[in-house]
Amino acid sequence: MPVTCGDMIVNVMNLPPFEAPVGVQIKRAFPGDRDKILRFIREHFHEGWALEAETALLQVPGTCFIAEEAGEILGFACYDVSALNFFGPTGVRQDARGRGIGRSLLLACLWAMRLKGYAYAVIGGGVLPQNRGRHVYSRW
């Protein structure tokens, strides 16, 4: 039986402009945000992603972005955690989905990867049917 990984390769030299949803701040996470971010991920997602995000927070510069509204975390996205050029993990709180937050977090990471000198990024599982973000990923 053939194995399908579902990874997607994205050309980061051809990205649309970055834009955050109205009222939402997308920012690079700092080590001081660690406890708040890890608590958010554990509450809304799972421990494995929290461990990966912690690795992203320890890198210099950090490779994790968060979306906040009124000081409350709505989502997160990381890159260069499991491998260089690799996007993820990422997640948006269920009640905040459908507002373009995931797209903005993705673009923040892809633009950061471009500025780091990458020409391409790998989105793990980007084309798998169960990936809620695959419709966004397929635009590039």
State what each model feature region is.
Residues V24-K36:
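A short beta-loop-alpha structural element at the N-terminal edge
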Residues A119:
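Short acidic/polar active-site loop segments enriched in Thr and Asp
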Residues V92, G98-M113, H135-R139:
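Conserved acetyl-CoA-binding loop-helix of GNAT-fold acetyltransferases
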Residues M1, Q94, I123-R134:
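Conserved beta-strand-loop-alpha-helix junction that forms the acyl-donor binding cleft
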